[in-house]
A protein has these predicted regions:
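Feature marks short, surface-exposed loop/turn motifs that line or immediately flank catalytic pockets
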Residues: 5, 56, 139-141
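Generic alpha-helical secondary structure signal
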Residues: 9, 29, 57, 121, ...
Length: 207
């Protein structure tokens, strides 16, 4: 996960950048990476760690989608409003150092992530060494931009309410995925935010 980086020193984020998580989630993921590293050192078990940025979207067929209880991911939470499951969406902080004051994230479609997993397994089966790869589109969108795009996709006004910041939320997380493209041969195909949200909406409105 990109949460292993914490507050980045530069954008886009490289795999070689420092890892200083700012929340328990990122800390546990970084601990897992360290366990894999030491397992390799001790037993020669090679691994690939895939650092997802913001996983999102659903299968284009509309038959496979994302559901958590409780839900914590931004796009599914937004889509709960037009689905009649909540009255509004909360924006946690609008005073960040970004173009509209809300957090910026790099959204990557689940189908592209699935393809990266297949390529990572092939890489290891072909004798690849242990390594870490970022997975993102290299483009950031603010929370307000995501909400506005969801309004366009769904045709619903989706009321938004400004709430206090959440502790440990970095202002910007945008990936450099050039390493995955170069070494794994990964080619993400779903970079358009409107398309990503449309696939998610196709699933959520029927489930």
């Amino acid at each position: 996960t990109a949460a292993t980086y914490g507050e980045p020193e530069s954008i886009p984020i490289l795999e070689s950048d420092k890892t200083e998580p700012t929340n328990p989630y990122g800390e546990t993921k970084l601990s897992m990476e360290k366990m894999m590293k030491w397992t390799d050192v001790a037993h020669g078990v090679h691994y690939v760690a895939l650092r997802y940025f913001n996983a999102c979207g659903a299968h284009v067929s509309g038959e496979i989608g994302e559901a958590h209880n409780p839900e914590t991911h931004l796009i599914p939470l937004i889509l709960q409003v037009p689905n009649g499951q909540r009255e509004s969406i909360s924006i946690f902080g609008d005073d960040y150092d970004t173009k509209d004051g809300t957090c910026v994230r790099d959204y990557i479609h689940v189908t592209d992530l699935a393809q990266a997993h297949i390529l990572a397994v092939k890489y290891l089966m072909d004798g690849g060494k242990s390594d870490v790869f970022n997975l993102g589109n290299g483009v950031g969108f603010t929370v307000k931009e995501v909400i506005e795009t969801a309004r366009k996709v769904t045709g619903h006004p989706i009321p938004a309410v400004i709430s206090p910041r959440r502790g440990g939320d970095p202002a910007k997380l945008i990936a450099s995925s050039e390493k995955a493209k170069s070494i794994l041969g990964w080619k993400p195909e779903h970079a358009d935010l409107e398309e990503i949200i449309a696939t998610a909406w196709k699933w959520h409105k029927n489930h």
